[in-house]
Amino acid sequence: MAESFEQRHATLIREFNEFLFEHPEFTEEIPQGATVVIQVADDQEYNAWSRALAEANREPGRPIVYVHVDALAPRRSRLVNPQIRLLR
């Protein structure tokens, strides 16, 4: 089970970083050096795992910021009008 949590965590962190890149004003709410903990609605097992990971890796005196998300939307392709041509 831990491996799937690790995979989900990597995906959520990547998506959160992309979100911050697209919405830089959001970074103003995150103190410098803070440990960011992503919490997903309706996934208490992952949330507990994520909090434990953050506490284990947190440097003393550093703040913790919880980022609550409702869900992760399906990834979409950004290809426009792809066409497949078979060469024989």
What is each PLM-predicted segment?
Residues 1-88:
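Terminal, compositionally biased segments used for targeting/anchoring and flexible tails
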